[in-house]
Amino acid sequence: MIAKYIRVASDLHLEQYYGADIDKIVEACLAPDDRDSASILVLAGDISSTPDQLVSFISKVEPRFRHVVYVPGNHEYYRHDITTWVSETRALFEAHTDRTSYALGDEVLCHNIDNVRFIFTTMWTAGGEDLAEMGAVGAALNDFRIIALNGERFTVPKMSYMHKKMKATVDTFLKSNPDAVNVVVTHHMPSYRLCHPRFGNTINGGFAFNGDAI
């Protein structure tokens, strides 16, 4: 059986409602649909920067769907160390979810779900196409002020290094079975063409990357 439907949600930023009734949050964000039981739910990042709320939300919606696929966005890591967040959140997922696939930190995973290959990752961006753009992104985005990695400040060069590894892994997965039905899930936009002209500027490299050739 091939998955009939994919339902997508992202950028819910539930931390703004921390402490609110989780059932009401679920109802507000994902009103029931008659097709849910035959659907794969894709949660493409920026769901909540609070691990317990994040996993509580997913554990509540999980029973309605055939499967859930989740990747963090950049905001999940706000006011956290990425390495610590990954460890704590993985433990919560293992304890409280049954049919959720998740790629945390710099992971890129490929899971076959109902004869569809889901390749999923946050896919951090390269930070821009040149040093000037990378400098502008570093100065403008809060990511590089309130996220840490291994006890040190997260930086654009560190993000760019992660991006190169993640992008290469996605490419390898796609080439390994080009005839498969592939769905690639990322938080950051996989093409600069997806940036609205209204927002076209030198910091687009903090939100999108050049994945047109993949």
Model-predicted segments: where are they?
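Glycine/small-residue-rich loop that forms an oxyanion/phosphate-binding "nest" at active or ligand-binding sites
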Residues: 82-104
